[in-house]
Amino acid sequence: MRIFCWKFWTKRSARFKVPAMKLIQHHYGKARVRVLKVFRKGARHSVKELEVQVMLEGNFDASFTKADNRLVVATDSMKNTINILARQKLGAETEEFGLALGAHFLKTYRHVSRVEVGLTEHCWARIPAGGKPHAHSFSEKGAATPFAKITCTRKDNQVESGIKDLLILKTTASGFKNFLRDEFTTLPETSDRILATKLRAVWRYRKKPGSYSRTNEKILEAMLAVFATKYSPSVQATLFQMGKAALKTALVISKVQITMPNRHCLLINLSPFGLENKNELFVPTDEPHGQIEGTVSR
């Protein structure tokens, strides 16, 4: 009986073959490689600190499907490469260093077809000492984090720059009215409110600028000028105006993607304590928050 059942099962199972599995996408690399470089010009020093990630695509299928590591570039080797090229090539321009890394991996490893380099900069400012900036002492600069994303192929290179984690706020010149109202709506309309957001913006270069860092600074300045000086009827409208300002300021970029989470500042109810709150005291909240995103292009 057991033999009969086994034969019966094997005959039936032959009709229901499990389809072959295949690997449809892969990449790998080294992440969170931190480098800090000191530039010395006499007694005056400057520093640049980056967190780098390198991801490779190419002929690595066998390492996943056959445990064949012969073409695998060890991630420890990637780390060493980043450190070496930082010593040799890292200067003021984050994007130039990313391009150098991408070019190196494509030139050195013929089986690599695509290199994605992510770079996040940790900015430093000079510590005031004796009424002037100190020559070689620094503190963390601001809240914004500049970053870059470099994609290199054998056909071309793509450079994207941006900033993230920039908390900006205006105490007036902002409102929100005439929005859709239905049975789920409780939000009151207003023509005067606090507008606060943690800005993230990334712009794509269509050609190389004279200086990536100066261009990035001008783009951010243009967007912040709109935020500060223009009345905001909604985060959506302000996002679009900021994107247009970026494109107008820098003709070398093709588009800008902006994320502006609406970090609500809620008026504190002081009436139980016999006090009136005339738009003076708020509770800033991170969640839940409105998530406003948009891309503006030419």
Each predicted region: which residue ranges?
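N-terminal intrinsically disordered, cationic/polar leader segments
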Residues: P19-R298
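Tryptophan (W) side chains
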Residues: W6-W9
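Short, Lys/Arg-enriched N-terminal segments with co-localized hydrophobic residues
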Residues: K11-A20
